[in-house]
Amino acid sequence: MTGKKRSASSSRWLQEHFSDKYVLQAQKKGLRSRAWFKLDEIQQGDKLFKPGMTVVDLGAAPGGWSQYVVTQIGSKGRVIACDILPMDPIVGVDFLQGDFREELVLKALLERVGETKVQVVMSDMAPNMTGTPAVDIPRSMYLCELALAMCRDVLAPGGSFLVKVFQGDGFEEYLREIRSLFTKVKIRKPDASRSRSREVYIVATGRKL
């Protein structure tokens, strides 16, 4: 019975995916993923990216966000990206493949950042979903906490943090923690996010000293 349910669910997801207007637009425009459109909508409203910025992209593969950011920060900007999965090269993006949860990978990522203070840390990280919120939400929140810890290490005063969060246990506490560190915090649900998904994006600007 479980297998049948999973098969039906997978088939439904595939049908939704390939008929999704953002997926179709991404394919037509030669974009890495539909995530490009999520970030574009956030940028139109919140103006996170400017020419010359240094940006850290966590959970970067297949590269939709990095691909978008390089169009905003220009040739003098820099994107440092990391993902456990491989990612095809993008001009202007320094990509590190590895598990961000591992100490050696985090150390290598921090070495690539160097002494430069980062203007934006963004995380589109998500665990492998089981479909069980009691399992998926804690795993997701753990990744969100790691992304916030990265902010503490590298984000410049006045910098911004963008993170994907799945609403559930721990969400309000995490939101309070972010509000204690940034002057302005908003919750966004871009049109390109699937309506039935629990995902939202926290946009935090003005990192406090």
From Swiss-Prot:
InterPro entries attached to this UniProt entry: RNA_methyltr_RlmE, RNA_MeTrfase_FtsJ_dom, rRNA-MeTfrase_E, rRNA_MeTrfase_gammaproteobac, SAM-dependent_MTases_sf
Superkingdom classification of source: Bacteria
Cystine crosslinks: none
GO cellular component, one term: cytoplasm
Catalytic residue positions: K164 (proton acceptor)
Gene3D superfamilies tied to this protein: Vaccinia Virus protein VP39
GO molecular function per UniProt: rRNA (uridine-2'-O-)-methyltransferase activity
Chain sites annotated for binding S-adenosyl-L-methionine: G63, W65, D83, D99, D124
Keyword Cytoplasm attributed: yes
Catalytic activity: uridine(2552) in 23S rRNA + S-adenosyl-L-methionine = 2'-O-methyluridine(2552) in 23S rRNA + S-adenosyl-L-homocysteine + H(+)
Keyword Phosphoprotein in annotation: no
Keywords: Cytoplasm, Methyltransferase, rRNA processing, S-adenosyl-L-methionine, Transferase
Its EC number(s): 2.1.1.166
Subcellular location field: Cytoplasm
Pfam families: FtsJ
Main location: cytoplasm
Classification via HAMAP family: RNA_methyltr_E
Biological role stated in the UniProt entry: Specifically methylates the uridine in position 2552 of 23S rRNA at the 2'-O position of the ribose in the fully assembled 50S ribosomal subunit.
Similarity annotation: Belongs to the class I-like SAM-binding methyltransferase superfamily. RNA methyltransferase RlmE family.
Listed name of the protein: Ribosomal RNA large subunit methyltransferase E
Species per Swiss-Prot/TrEMBL record: Erwinia tasmaniensis (strain DSM 17950 / CFBP 7177 / CIP 109463 / NCPPB 4357 / Et1/99)
Source lineage: Bacteria, Pseudomonadati, Pseudomonadota, Gammaproteobacteria, Enterobacterales
